[in-house]
Amino acid sequence: MTLAFGEWIIHRRWYAGRTRELASVEPAAVTALGGGLDHVLLDVAYTDGSTERYQVLVQWESEPVDGYGEAALIGTASGPDGTRVAYDALFNPEAAGRLLSLINRSETIGELTFSREPDVTLPVDAPAKVSGAEQSNTSVIFGKDAMLKVFRRVTPGVNPDIELNRVLARAGNPHVATLLGAFETSSCALGMVTAFAANSAEGWDMATASVHDLFANEVGGDFADESRRLGAAVASVHATLADTLGTSVTQFPIDTVLERLRSATRAAPELAPYAPQIEQRFRRLADQPIRVHRIHGDLHLGQVLRTPESWLLIDFEGEPGQPLEERRRPDSPLRDVAGVLRSFEYAAYQQVVTGGGDPQMADRARSWVDRNVDAFCAGYAAVAGEDPRASGDVLAAYELDKAVYEAAYEARFRPSWLPIPMRSIQRLVS
């Protein structure tokens, strides 16, 4: 295979190597799936010595095809049969359907194993369309029934998104999209199929619309009832994971949060005046026993969907950028709770920041946040039997840890939003 993948991959939204200098991109494994469709694993090397593996499905055509779109064009390659054009196959409905059919038939081709979950049938004849919503993976929607998520950056080991969705679905938890199938090699997961949440709305969009309505008039859109339902859904998922996979007790992760604080302070010097107080808050918990079990790991309002029936939690892959073993490590459910509480603050205050920081808007944003935090925690407590705020200092520490991470991110990539986490840090350490 002589395709110049390097020039193509650096422009993909899911490519994670933008901060490093690319050294080489080479096919590590190519598996023919029939009909001009190749499954390709790419080894990407960087000049700093680090490496990553990416997954691409290549559809070969004898001549250019307009229907794919510019983003799908990988390049051309010459061979005994002449020059052929290569496209990202997920943008081809027929090729995507062929992949779904392999999963539906639970086939094995070379090193690739396709498997369908028991007692389900996949909509192999449904029209396929690539979703534009994701950054790190690529999803294809089949009609109104199923969604195929293809992992772009693949890592050896058990994929937590497949693992936890399977556990929750088989336990009958109603707050996840049912896992329908998957495909993998002997060493790594490559993709999964879940039931598609048709007619759903993302929690972030609903929350920011509520805040926008609030700023537009005194009555505003009220999100508190939905926050209460969301709290109950999160508690339900936590309970199922704890009951199914077990719990244990460990110490508060003092070394991890202190290292994150040091790293973030280098990236965001604005943290420096607060660093001693933050460190003191963390160190007070150094010997604190923490109940842990498997959790979502990267929960926020962009990771939840409101369907006509209920809230669904999606994308159980864990915190982006963390090693797989860290993403699968049991953690406190308060980390997920803190992620949602931080998301409430972002939903409210990002409109204050973009609106020029008007004090009256800030006061109304604070009221909106407080109302939705109260509702979420009440919904959580109704299922879990305890309000997460009863853990006081521990919950605040997880919120601080998240806000410290956010401050470093905003300082690097979105400085105009840095006041959002800084405002929260000031409040939490006071």
From Swiss-Prot:
GO biological process: carbohydrate phosphorylation; glycogen biosynthetic process; trehalose biosynthetic process
Pathway(s) of this molecule: Glycan biosynthesis; glycogen biosynthesis
Keyword Kinase listed: yes
Pfam families (UniProt xref): Mak_N_cap
Family matches, as InterPro entries: Kinase-like_dom_sf, Mak_N_cap
Highest rank taxon of the organism: Bacteria
Keyword tags: ATP-binding, Carbohydrate metabolism, Glycogen biosynthesis, Glycogen metabolism, Kinase, Nucleotide-binding, Transferase
UniProt-listed Enzyme Commission number(s): 2.7.1.175
Name recorded for this polypeptide: Maltokinase
GO terms assigned for molecular function: ATP binding; kinase activity
Membrane-traversing stretches: none
Enzyme class, broadest EC rank: transferase
Biological function: Catalyzes the ATP-dependent phosphorylation of maltose to maltose 1-phosphate. Is involved in a branched alpha-glucan biosynthetic pathway from trehalose, together with TreS, GlgE and GlgB.
